[in-house]
C-alpha cells in the first residue's frame, strides 16, 4: 500500500478505501445526469408540458450520439490503465493523447451527421406537428456542440485513470453548477424556454469537456497522464473502441429503448405517458449514476491489477464490490418507493392526473434498482479486464434485447402496468446471464 495519503491504483483496497476512491466518480456521474434533469425541471415548470414532452422525445437521439465519447473514455482508460500497470508510462500518455484527438475528430463528424438527420429522426420518434418545432430547436443547439459533450465523457474516465478523481469531480461539479445557474436565469427568469435550456447545457458541457484540456496540456506533479505527441495507431484506437463497445451499446440501447417506450406510451396514455416516463428517466439517471460512477471508479483499479497479474486483488475487488452494490441496491429501492410521490411532484405537481400516473409508474419501475447495479458493474468489470466481447454481450442483452421483448410483450400479458415492469423483467433476465459470464470466466482471470 502506498505510504502517501493519495490513493493509488497499485494499492490494496479495503471497503473504506474503495468507497473513498469511487466517491468522486459517483458524484461526477450524478452531476452529469443533472444536466437533463435540471433542463427538464425548468422546462416542465416554466415552459409547459408540450416543451417538456418534446425535450424527452428528442433527447434519446442526442444521447445516442454523445455516448461515443463514453465508449472511447471507458475503453481507452482501461487500455491506458493496463499499460500503466505494465510500467510503460510513456506509451500510456501517447495513447491517451491519441484518444483525445480522436474524440475531437469523431465529435465534429457526428455533429454534422446528427444535424442532417435531426428532422427525419424526430418524425420517426413520433414528433407531432405540435412537438416537431420544439424538438428541432433543442436538438440543433445541442448537436452543434456535440464534441464538448463527448470530451466531457472522455475526461471523466481519464481523471480516474490519472489518479485524480477529485479533480474530475471539481470539473463536473463546476459544469453542473453552471448548468443550474444558467437554467434558472435563461429559462426561469428570462423565459427563453427550450432555447435557454439547451444553451445552458452547452455552456456547462464546455466547462466539463473543454476546460480539462488546459489541465492535461502540461505534465503536472502527482498526475500520471498528460497530453503529449499522440501515438497514431488505428489498431490501438480500434482496441480501445471495441473494449468500450459495451458502454456504447448500453447508451445506444438505452436511447433506442427510450424511443420505443415513448412510442408505446403515446399509444397507451398520449403525451402524458411520455411526460411521466421522462420523470422516471430523471430519477433513474440519478440512481443509475451511482452504479455507473462506482463501476467507472473501480475499472482502472481492476485494469491495473489485471495488467500487473495480481489475482488476489482482483478477487478482493470483486467480492467487496458485490457487497457494496447489494447494500446500495436495497437502499435505492427503499428510498425510491418512499419518495415516489414527492419526486414526481417536483416535475409534474401542476397536473393531478399526470402526477398520479407518474407516481404509480415510478413505484413499479424502481424495483429494478435492486438488480441493475450487478449488471452495470458486471459489464464494466469485463471492460476493465479488456474483454469487450463479454461486456458488450451483457450490455446488449440487458439494455436492448430483454427490454425490447419485455416492452412489447408484458403489456399484452398483464396490461398497462407491464410497460413500467418491463425494465424489472429485463434486469432479472440479464442478472442470470451476468452471473453465468462471471462463473465461466473464473479460471481465465482468477477472480473467484
Language model features: what each stretch is:
Residues 52-112, 149-168, 276-340, 372-394:
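Small-residue-rich hydrophobic transmembrane alpha-helices
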Residues 27, 31, 35, 65-69, ...:
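Residue-level hotspots within pore-lining transmembrane alpha-helices
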Residues 1-25, 80-147, 189-245, 302-368, ...:
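Short alpha-helical transmembrane segments in multi-pass integral membrane proteins
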